[in-house]
Amino acid sequence: MFDPLDLYTPDDIQVEALQFNLAEREPKDPCSPQRDEILTAVDEEESDDDDTIIDNLDLPSVKYAPPEVILCILILLKPDRQVNFNQETGKNKSVLEVCKSHGLEPDLLKRLLTWYTEEWPNKRLNSLEKICNKIPMLRFTVSKELLLGYYTSVLKKYNNSCGLNEEIIQELLKELSSRISENCGRTAQPSIVRYFELRNLSTSIPLHEPSLTADNLGWKTWGSSLILSQLVVDHLDYLHTTNVNMLANSDIKQIKVLELGAGTGLVGLSWALKWKELYGTENIEIFVTDLPEIVTNLKKNVSLNNLGDFVQAEILDWTNPHDFIDKFGHENEFDVILIADPIYSPQHPEWVVNMISKFLAASGTCHLEIPLRAKYAKEREVLKLLLKESDLKVVEERHSEGVDDWGAVKYLYRQIVRN
């Protein structure tokens, strides 16, 4: 059973700091002069400026705040919608927008407001607008270590709690587990829906990414897919009409597009969405393919983008493509082949070239994007040699740079045709 405590153990200094020294600050009598002195001192230190930055000490006391207040904080600290490989900062959103994007119930938010205005007054957080804009920003202004320390303090209090609202506690622990996982890097994160926005494409592309594991790298969208998708969207009309020499109209045969090793399907779905904008859905058939364990999620992404009428997610094993051929035919029939980041083992260059040779039509074009990882420099050279030996010609190359979840990466694009 997963225990988030295994991920992080704050040192004694951090835990003490995150308790806000409440044992010293909290008066025994709520009406005593000691409390008045505390609030007066806090008031003098706080600014009336709505832009005043808050810090971890402004988070509700784990010791004294009710679970509804802690739950609301955890929901507000949920990451914003991920666009490409970045997060929206959450600045200047309305209360309604924050509630909608975070799935936050208004009554829960009002409970947090009561905490900051009546139970533990804080001028920096004494309105719904301040709460909704400042609390989410703590993910960017407070260190991960301090946030993890706060989360751990919450876990210690509520993991074995009893006598409290069981439904609230279960929801709190669920949100808490997600916040801890999100704070520990991409490989520890739960499943997410990431949105991709491309120039010259009128709609964003939602893609579901399950939790990433070492043996299922296809569950993640890699940077090379974004680079190739942008190229496709920017130049689809040129790439298609110049190299395949046909247009999508009622007088032309059906055009067939194949994405190999599609993963989450970004490249194939980008092609499909741009094609739909330009020409509609007539005379086009698109296959996004991968291994069996990847295709289930791939089907979900086709559905998320409402492309099921002309895009099929299917199994295509590069070591045994006969099942795909027996089911659909199409050997040497694809006008366009799309491949992004296919080289991450010594066997892949041969498999990739075999698939291009087997499925590319005589007048077709393959668009290949590969990251220039030092670890696979030898495999890239083998790929280049095998392309020449297989009567395939690189007619265009271009270098580019981009980013993914692990930082900046350099990429190489190749446009490939038959000799």
From Swiss-Prot:
Its main location: cytoplasm. The keyword S-adenosyl-L-methionine applies. CDD domains: AdoMet_MTases (cd02440). InterPro entries: Methyltransf_16, SAM-dependent_MTases_sf. It comes from the Eukaryota. The keyword Disulfide bond does not apply. Its EC number is 2.1.1.-. Transmembrane segments: none annotated. Gene3D superfamilies: Vaccinia Virus protein VP39. Disruption phenotype: Increases sensitivity to antibiotics that target translation and decreases translational fidelity. GO terms for molecular function: protein methyltransferase activity; protein-lysine N-methyltransferase activity; S-adenosylmethionine-dependent methyltransferase activity. S-adenosyl-L-methionine binds at W222, G261, A262, G263, D290, W318, A340. SUPFAM superfamilies: S-adenosyl-L-methionine-dependent methyltransferases. One of its GO terms (cellular component) is cytoplasm. It is found in: Cytoplasm. Keywords: Cytoplasm, Methyltransferase, S-adenosyl-L-methionine, Transferase. S-adenosyl-L-methionine-dependent protein-lysine N-methyltransferase that mono- and dimethylates elongation factor 2 (EFT1/EFT2) at 'Lys-613' and methylates elongation factor 3A (YEF3). Present with 217 molecules/cell in log phase SD medium. Belongs to the class I-like SAM-binding methyltransferase superfamily. METTL21 family. This is Protein-lysine N-methyltransferase EFM2. The lineage of its organism: Eukaryota, Fungi, Dikarya, Ascomycota, Saccharomycotina.
